[in-house]
């Protein structure tokens, strides 16, 4: 008994692919005319070439030809194989030339980002100033930084915009990978590597520093010494009494401060 057209479409689902995606086709990279399982496989391969001038990334939209993994037929990019009739990807984006059999990821294409995302369209919104899709919980609930996602992670330096790893938006609006953020916190680093703002609530730490300073008298030579500081949390500049333990911002009460030269007053 012959398989129905619908059964044929789903033949081999989740049975092919690479470590990045389950799909029933390979792509021919137009930049080097080589065949790879996916764009990431291409980029990983070319990034290790001996000659640095040969290293390059594949532009996803440039892919024109794919090879069906079921029947090995090379053909123009499309969802259904022109020869054997299988879906080469249960999810297919004709803009990104993106195939994926694992639809539990809830893939969707964002026109503003220009690429496909995962997690379900209803769970995300596109922030035009930050230049990327964010979880709906961040709508009107994050500090906008222009094109904040179109940068490299400040810890591992992987480009964030199209990274496969989860990304964290910090209180300051800057972004980094979730795993890099967690590792940073684990190592007792609580400031953004880019702007130095505190990334978590530090009020209890500031309270402990208040108590330490109150219990630690400075030598008489330093009791009246004052310094100018810049607060990394509120960007205010103030003149405060110097203390070896730390200088407290007179505006927001943070100890995340640094000494600066006195301001030059206009003549």
From Swiss-Prot:
Record's catalysed reaction(s): S-ubiquitinyl-[E2 ubiquitin-conjugating enzyme]-L-cysteine + [acceptor protein]-L-lysine = [E2 ubiquitin-conjugating enzyme]-L-cysteine + N(6)-ubiquitinyl-[acceptor protein]-L-lysine
Binding site for Zn(2+) 4: 93, 96, 109, 116
Documented effect of changing residue 177 to A: Loss of activity
Annotated keywords: Cytoplasm, Metal-binding, Nucleus, Phosphoprotein, Plant defense, Transferase, Ubl conjugation, Ubl conjugation pathway, Zinc, Zinc-finger
Binding-site residues for Zn(2+) 3, renumbered to this chain: 68, 71, 81, 84
Residues bound to Zn(2+) 5: 110, 113, 126, 133
RING-type zinc finger span: 153-196
Enzyme Commission designation: 2.3.2.27
Annotated positions binding Zn(2+) 6: 127, 130, 142, 144
A GO molecular-function descriptor: ubiquitin-protein transferase activity
Residue ranges covered by zinc fingers (CTCHY-type): 88-152
Subunit structure: Interacts with MYB30. Interacts with GILP.
Protein name: E3 ubiquitin-protein ligase MIEL1
Originating organism: Arabidopsis thaliana
């Amino acid at each position: 008994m012959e398989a129905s057209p619908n059964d044929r479409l789903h033949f081999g689902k989740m049975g092919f692919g690479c470590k990045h995606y389950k799909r029933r086709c390979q792509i021919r990279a137009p930049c080097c005319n080589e065949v790879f399982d996916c764009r990431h496989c291409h980029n990983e391969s070319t990034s290790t070439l001996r000659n640095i001038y040969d290293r390059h990334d594949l532009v996803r939209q440039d892919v024109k030809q794919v090879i069906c993994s079921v029947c090995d037929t090379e053909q123009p990019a499309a969802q259904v194989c022109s020869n054997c009739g299988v879906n080469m990807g249960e999810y297919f984006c004709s803009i990104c030339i993106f195939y994926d059999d694992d639809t539990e990821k809830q893939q969707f294409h964002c026109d503003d980002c220009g690429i496909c995302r995962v997690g379900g369209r209803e769970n995300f919104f596109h922030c035009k100033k930050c230049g990327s899709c964010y979880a709906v919980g961040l709508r009107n609930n994050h500090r906008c930084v222009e094109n904040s996602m179109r940068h490299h992670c400040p810890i591992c330096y992987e480009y964030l915009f199209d990274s496969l790893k989860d990304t964290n938006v910090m209180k300051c609006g800057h972004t980094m990978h979730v795993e890099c953020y967690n590792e940073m916190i684990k190592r007792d680093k609580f400031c953004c590597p880019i702007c130095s703002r505190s990334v978590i609530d530090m009020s209890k730490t500031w309270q402990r520093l208040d108590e330490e300073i109150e219990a630690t008298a400075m030598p008489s030579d330093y009791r009246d010494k004052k310094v100018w500081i810049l607060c990394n949390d509120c960007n205010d500049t103030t003149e405060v009494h110097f203390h070896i333990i730390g200088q407290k911002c007179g505006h927001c009460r943070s100890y995340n401060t640094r000494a600066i030269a006195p301001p030059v007053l206009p003549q």
